[in-house]
Structures are given as C-alpha cells and as structure tokens.
C-alpha cells in the first residue's frame, strides 16, 4: 500500500480522521501527515490539567511548523499516516520510532504536516509518577534520534534546521541550562557574598526548587493551586529529561515498556 496509518491501540479516532489524514497526500511532496490529540480532564487532582495544556500547545506548534515550514518535527505517535516508501527498519532497542520515521521523512526532503482536523482522543496519564516514567523514556529515545539526525541542523535548509533547533533541541537542553544556572548562581554568590543582585538570583533559584515541595504538601491537604502544580510539572519533566539522558548514556538495553496508566 502507498499510505500506511500508524495508530496506538488505546486511541479513539474521530469519524473523519482517516479522510483528513489522507487528503494531504494529494500533494506528491507530502510524506507524512499527523493527527492531533484531544484530551478530556476526568480528574484534575494530579497533573491532568497541566498535561492537557502541554499537549494543546504542542499540537499548535506542530500544526504551524507544518504550515510555515512543511516540517512538523515529530508526529504524535498516537496516530499518523506515512507513505510506505518512507517506512524504514527501526534500529534495535529504539524507544521513539514515530520520531525516527518523522525525521526520516524530512531527511528525504519530503513534507511532514499535522492536520488539526484529523483528531484522535486519548485519556490523560493518571499521576505525575506515571507521566514522569513516560517522559524519561521519551527523553532517552529523543537522544537516540538526535545522535542519528543531528546533521539535519546543517545539512538541510533552514526549513528543517530552524524548527528542529527551536522546538526540540532547545527543550532537550533545558535541564542542563537549569542545572548550569543553579551552579553559577551558587558560585557567583560565593565570590560576591555582599552583592544584592547575586543574593536575589540565588533566592529565586532556591525558590524554584522549593515550590514543588510546597505543592506536594498542599496536595496532601487537598489544596490545588494551578500555577504551583504547573511549576512542579515543569521541574519534574526536566528532571525526567535529565534522567532519560543518563539512561541513553548508559545504553538502552530494551525498547519494551510498560503502558502508561491513564485516567
């Protein structure tokens, strides 16, 4: 078959989803078309709202990358259609085959799009712990792909390099940037202990690390503050990305993973 649809088993698609995916392939230059994910919040006691917000913004970025550059950087693995000629053998122990195939489409100078009218529905992860494990696995898979496709930053034209760097690589660098900022703030304060500015920076850095603990305490008291929960979600996902990087450095031994428990 010329077009293959990849879909997760836990996905429910809107009735016209396949038609919306297929219509973009009238353009022979299109190699992949991805759907967007919609979630409903059944239980907002943990990080469901924050994950829903993240997925919504991520979908908007992917849609506009396709419209502006013809280069959606990484289709949602939940549901996408791809020309069969771009489906290649996935390397052993690879964790993010959807991202691998998406970048392969761009490497072949084909267009990668996201159609906002192709909609699928998926339940949100049940807890922060579940999403943490998933993001850690995704992070390790992202670095696997980066090792293979980093050349896209300079060997292809800017339509691929710009969104790849600004959307993905900058995000993957964020744990290291945060860690560097913390270390530098400590060093600067040690060098200039009387500096008001360095004291302020250090206090702000310390507050960023303490706020997630405040959210944990408030949650146990059945108090939910959305901004605090969002901040805890942000810090937790960056820790997960860093640990995923460590997993990649150590070497991924298997691509078998336990499905995420969802609401």
Write out the residue ranges for each language-model feature.
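Conserved nucleotide-sugar donor-binding
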Residues: 1, 75-89
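Short acidic donor-binding/metal-coordinating loop in glycosyltransferase active sites
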Residues: 1, 9-11, 97
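Catalytic donor/gating beta->alpha subdomain of glycosyltransferases that bind UDP-sugars
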Residues: 25-59, 93-94, 102-167, 233, ...
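Membrane-embedded multi-pass helical conduit in multi-pass membrane proteins
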Residues: 171-253
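Loop-to-transmembrane-helix entry motif
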Residues: 68, 142, 172-176
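Acidic donor-binding/catalytic loop of UDP-sugar-dependent glycosyltransferases
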Residues: 8-24
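Membrane-proximal intrinsically disordered regions of secretory-pathway and membrane-system proteins
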Residues: 256-263
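Short aromatic/hydrophobic "clamp" motif used to bind/position activated sugar donors
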Residues: 4
């Amino acid at each position: 078959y010329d077009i293959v649809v990849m879909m997760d088993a836990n996905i429910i698609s809107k009735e016209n989803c396949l038609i919306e995916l297929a219509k973009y392939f009238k353009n022979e230059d299109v190699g992949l078309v991805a759907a967007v994910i919609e979630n409903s919040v059944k239980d907002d006691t943990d990080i469901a709202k924050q994950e829903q917000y993240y997925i919504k913004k991520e979908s908007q970025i992917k849609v506009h990358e396709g419209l502006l550059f013809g280069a959606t950087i990484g289709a949602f693995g939940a549901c996408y259609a791809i020309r069969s000629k771009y489906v290649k053998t996935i390397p052993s122990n690879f964790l993010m085959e959807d991202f691998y195939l998406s970048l392969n489409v761009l490497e072949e100078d084909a267009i990668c799009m996201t159609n906002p009218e192709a909609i699928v529905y998926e339940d949100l992860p049940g807890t922060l712990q579940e999403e943490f494990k998933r993001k850690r696995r995704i992070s390790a898979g992202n670095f696997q792909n980066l090792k293979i496709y980093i050349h896209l930053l300079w060997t292809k034209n800017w339509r691929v390099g710009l969104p790849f760097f600004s959307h993905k690589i900058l995000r993957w660098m964020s744990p290291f940037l945060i860690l560097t900022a913390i270390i530098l703030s400590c060093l600067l304060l040690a060098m200039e202990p009387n500096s008001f500015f360095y004291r302020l920076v250090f206090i702000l850095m310390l507050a960023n690390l303490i706020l997630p603990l405040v959210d944990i305490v408030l949650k146990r008291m059945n108090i939910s503050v959305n901004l605090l929960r969002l901040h805890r979600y942000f810090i937790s996902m960056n820790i997960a990305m860093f640990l995923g990087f460590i997993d990649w450095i150590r070497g991924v031994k298997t691509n078998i993973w336990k499905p995420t428990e969802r609401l």
